[in-house]
Each structure stands twice: as structure tokens, then as C-alpha cells.
UniProtKB/Swiss-Prot annotation:
Its EC number is 5.1.-.-. It comes from Gibberella zeae (strain ATCC MYA-4620 / CBS 123657 / FGSC 9075 / NRRL 31084 / PH-1) (Wheat head blight fungus). SUPFAM superfamilies: Galactose mutarotase-like. The gene is FSL3. This is Epimerase FSL3. Belongs to the aldose epimerase family. The active site is at E392 (proton acceptor).
Amino acid sequence: MSVTRLSEPLQNILLQDLRNFYDRASRIATLSVSAIAAIKSAWTRGSPFAAATALYPTNEEGKYVIQAEGIRMEFTNYGGAVTNLWLNNSRGEEVDIVLGLDHARDYEDYPKNPYLNGAIGRYAGFMRGGRFDMDGESYQVATNAHNGSSTFNGGDRGWGRSILDIGSHTENSITFVLFDRSWNGFPGTAASCLTHTVTPYEWRVAFGVTPTKKPGPINMSQQAFFNLDGFKKKNLTGSVPVSDKTVRDHKLHLPLSGLRFETDALGLSTGDILGNPRGSEYDFWSASRRIGDVLEKPYMGICDRCQKRQYHNHNPSGAYDTIFQLGRSQPWNKEDVPAAILSSPESGISMKLYSDQEALHVHTWSQKEFPLKLKKGQGQGMVPQHGGISFEMQDWPDGLNHPEWRRESKTIWGMDGLYTAFSSYRFSVDKTEP
């Protein structure tokens, strides 16, 4: 039996035809996926951006990657959550400095998803009774906290627990898009976008929300739990138990935090704004301070509200949990003074947070409430108590129900308005050995 060999030119023609066929098939498959996604999204969420979402590729963990010099980040479109943030520490090791989950699909399956590093909206924090008044009319929204007596972070169908579409995705930027059509009972439709951008050693966050059909309350935030060591903490023997890989040895400075919002035993704002005396467990304004010094400091006396001996707050989980009012000299610019400065002597990494929002919710990770495994690049075991610390920029907590604060122009947005909020995280690394 003889075998006829094709000439090289003919082989090349056939190979090119195969490539063209493969390309056409791939485009058809992609368009089919896009069409299915668009139909599904239009049916369930009414978003015109679903088709575009299907065109943007993810990595093998189902995450979207953006990067610039000195920084690389990954996201999932479930809540627009930050899943990974890599920097090099002072030893030149790449470390992932945020809490998260290994695969994008894990976020939707996480049974107690505490809005893990996602966008928070329409309304960040607690809303007492799930009620508010607007233009002489009372509104009741869905409640999801305190046995149905309060609304937390916009409700069970808050933006941090929703699938967001992708408006655009470039090498160093990603924009998530969401159309909230009266979810959880909030009035009107909120057309919104959230853009994450990285520049050399910097992560920028920008919110833009436009109410349509009816005015409504808007108070956006972005959660991110940081551990600047990336759980790579070492000692003289080179090994540290996971339980010691916390943020206790991180140093924190909140230069603008001379005041805080008083909360009751449930964490709801009472309407009072209190001073933070120098040297108290709330004093992060006078100087940089080791976080563990506050976590380990006993509260000297009996709390007036709960009549129990407390050491710094009313969070039953034992996590640090305080909302600070940011005091700025007028006129001010968000670039003038950072709202927070976090640093780790261990990794040599420092972070400065700048924002145009006027309240800062600081809380440490509560392993008791939300058991969470370390990501595979961070080691073995569970995230320990105080294993991370989050800084949520927002407006004054539950300002809707405290008219004495006169925050209507900051919390109620009409159809002729555009709500915006900007934050930036700037990183630096001390190259000397810690």
C-alpha cells in the first residue's frame, strides 16, 4: 500500500483552513455563550452588559486579573469581590495580602459569606428597623439582621451577594456594572458601576451610581480584609503557628479619627458622636499604634450600656469593630491626609488609604463568626481570630434615621444626581530586612 505525501504548500493551505475553521467555531461558541448569558441576565437581572461579560476571559480559577508595576490583583464578579492582591515583601517574596477563597465559584457557595471583600450597597452598614423616611413617605426594606429587626449592608440581596456584569476589562482596570431594580424594597432603579484600577503600587476604587425612576438612599463601600504579612510571618526558628499569623503586630495610624460614632449593643448607631481620648482604646489618631496593644487592653470599668466589663467594643465575636468619623480641616481634598496608614514590621509593607468619604469602619476578622480557610498560596489551616483587618469607607452610619445630622444631601440621591465615591490604596515596601 502506497502513501501519498502532500506537498508542503498544500499542507500549509490545509493547516490554514483548519485554523480558520477553528477560529470560526470558537467565535460561534463564544457568541452562543454570550447570547445565552445575555438572555439569562436580561431575564434575571435586566442587565444589557451580560453579553460583554461573556467575552472577557477569566483565569483557571474563574477570576479576572489586572496588574501594574509592583501589584497584581484578581476579582470575581460575585459581589465584585477582591480575591487576591499580590505584592513583594522586603525579602522579595510575593505575598497575597487579602483574605479570600481559592476559586471564584467558592464565593457563591460560601455558606456564611460575610460580603467577603465585595462591594457593599445599596446602603452600607446597619439600618435600624429597615425603615427610612423620604419626601414625606415612609419606606420599609427587607431586613436580614438582628432577627429581622434591622437591615445590614443592603439586605440579603445586597450588591456584595449578587452577580455583577463586566462593563470593561483591560490589563490594569476592570469595571463591574449592576442594575438594582428595587431589590430588597429600595425605591427605584440604581444604575451603577464600580471600577478598580491599578497603577504602580496603587489600587484605586471608584463608584458611580445614578438613581432612575425614583430618588433613593445610596451609601456605598468596598470591603477588603488585609494581612500585610500574607500569613508568611516567621521567627528566629523560621516557623510560626497559624494562630500567631494575625494583624496584632501590624501598626495602625488613623490621623483623622478623633471622633467615633456611638453604637448600642447590637452595633446600631445611637446618634451620638464621641471623642477618642489620647491613650484610650480608640486612640489611633495621635500616633501609629500596634493593633495588639488595643486588642489586649482591658476595658477599665463597667460599660454604661450593657453593664458588663468590656475591653473595647460591643461585638460579641471579640473582633475590634468601630466606626470613626473623619475630621478634616476645611477646605479639604481627599489627597491631603490619608484616612488610614497600616504597616507591618515583619513584611516591610505599608499601605496608605485615601478617600473622599467621611466615615471609616474598622474591624478585624472574626474567626468565631466566619470560619475561613487560608488560600492555597497562604499556607495551611484556618484564618485565625484577628487574621485580617478591614477598612470600609462609607458615609455616616444609618444617617437616614438621624435627621439631626443633616446628611440628606449625602445619603438621598435624586434622578438628576450622580453619586460618586473614590478611594485609593497606596503601597510601599521597605527593602531593608525586618
